[in-house]
C-alpha cells in the first residue's frame, strides 16, 4: 500500500543479504566462520543458502543499524558483501 504514515510501503521495507566466503582450512578459521554465522542468526538473519543470509528490516534506518552490526562481526580474513534491497525488489526476484 502507498499512503499515509504507518501504512505498509514496499519501497520503505528493506531486505538485507549478507553473502560471504570465509576461509575454513584450519580449525581456528572454521571456528571464526561458525561464530560469524551464529552471530548473524543472533541478529535475526536466516540462512537463504549456505553462505547467504537474509533479514527483513522495517525501514532503511533499521537496515542501517543491522549493516553496522554486521560490519563489526566481519572476520579479518575472507570476503563479506552486504546487499540492501527494497521489499518490492525482493518480491520481484526470480
Predicted feature residues:
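Basic nucleic-acid-binding interfaces
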Residues: 2-17, 22-94
Amino acid at each position: 500500500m502507498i499512503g499515509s504514515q504507518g501504512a505498509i510501503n514496499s519501497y520503505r521495507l528493506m531486505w538485507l543479504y549478507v553473502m560471504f566466503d570465509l576461509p575454513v582450512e584450519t580449525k581456528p578459521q572454521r571456528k571464526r566462520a561458525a561464530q560469524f554465522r551464529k552471530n548473524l542468526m543472533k541478529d535475526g538473519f536466516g540462512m537463504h543458502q549456505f553462505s547467504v543470509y537474509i533479514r527483513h528490516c522495517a525501514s532503511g534506518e533499521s537496515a542501517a543499524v543491522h549493516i553496522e552490526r554486521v560490519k563489526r562481526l566481519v572476520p579479518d580474513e575472507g570476503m563479506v558483501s552486504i546487499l540492501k534491497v527494497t521489499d518490492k525488489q525482493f518480491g520481484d526476484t526470480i
